[in-house]
Regions:
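A short beta-strand-loop structural module common to alpha/beta enzyme folds
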Residues: 38-48
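Juxtamembrane luminal stem/stalk of type II transmembrane Golgi/ER carbohydrate-processing enzymes
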Residues: 1-9
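Secretory-pathway luminal glycosyltransferase catalytic domains
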Residues: 52-166
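Short amphipathic alpha-helix
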Residues: 24-31
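A short, glycine/small-residue-rich beta-strand->loop->alpha-helix junction that serves as a flexible
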Residues: 14-23
């Protein structure tokens, strides 16, 4: 068995509304593929996105995405005033480096190299936006709505009729 100590790992927490989370996940997937970094995604149901992953999407085929547990809320949630920044204490112990969601925009403005940052390290990142060039074909590869959501979409399309405006 190979020594796994030097393997790159990224625990990724997407945040914001659905569109923001999907853009952030696509960026994290591209980062993972570009660097050979093992990607784990933890999905938090919160005020920004009031649904669990499994309520809207089928499981991802090639990436580990799981719903957040109560323990995850303590350890992996985004550090904020309302959780007294407690998760940051655990994250500083568990990860070599971390990027919080509010750090991403300033880093992008400085042309930060996210790939160099992630490669060879055990990292944590929370994010609500894309970071890096996004391959739009990944959206359909990664995100497959549940059958119930597909049926709701079909019903809504039928109601639009033949001449929708907008």
């Amino acid at each position: 068995m190979k020594d796994d100590k030097n393997k790159s790992r990224l625990l990724f927490v997407p945040s914001g509304g659905l569109g923001n989370r999907l853009r952030a996940i696509v960026s994290a997937v591209q980062l993972s593929e570009a660097t050979g970094t093992a990607l784990r995604i933890v999905w938090f149901k919160d005020w920004g996105m009031g649904a669990e992953w499994r309520e809207i999407f089928k499981p991802m085929k090639h990436y580990a995405l799981r719903e957040a547990s109560l323990l995850d809320s303590l350890v992996y949630d985004r550090p904020r005033k309302r959780n007294f920044f407690v998760p940051k204490l655990f994250q500083n112990l568990l990860f070599e480096q971390r990027i919080d969601e509010y750090d991403v925009t300033p880093l992008k403005r400085k042309n930060f190299d996210f790939c160099a940052w992630a490669k060879g390290r055990n990292s944590y990142m929370s994010c609500y936006q894309d970071f890096g060039a996004v391959d739009n074909s990944l959206y359909s590869d990664l995100f497959s709505p549940t059958d119930e959501i597909e049926q709701r979409i079909a019903r809504n399309l039928e109601q639009l009729g033949d001449a929708p405006i907008g």
